[in-house]
């Protein structure tokens, strides 16, 4: 399991979890979005622009 806090959001992912590769994003203990990393679209919830920017940053850093 990976867990990272950035920009006021908590990003949680599991290695070997079911496909597609995805990340859960929380703020204040509530799920903001479950984001499909392979297809670049929400699986649940909606992703505000700051979350999309942070996901792109984390992917470019090799963290997701």
Could you say what each language-model-derived stretch is?
Residues 1-21, 25-64:
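Metal-centered catalytic cores of metalloenzymes
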């Amino acid at each position: 399991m990976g867990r990272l806090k950035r920009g006021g959001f908590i990003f949680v992912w599991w290695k070997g979890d079911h496909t597609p590769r995805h990340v859960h994003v929380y703020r204040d203990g509530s799920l903001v979005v479950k984001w499909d990393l392979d297809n670049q679209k929400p699986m649940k919830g909606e992703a505000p622009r700051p979350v999309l920017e942070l996901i792109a940053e984390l992917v470019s850093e090799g963290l997701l």
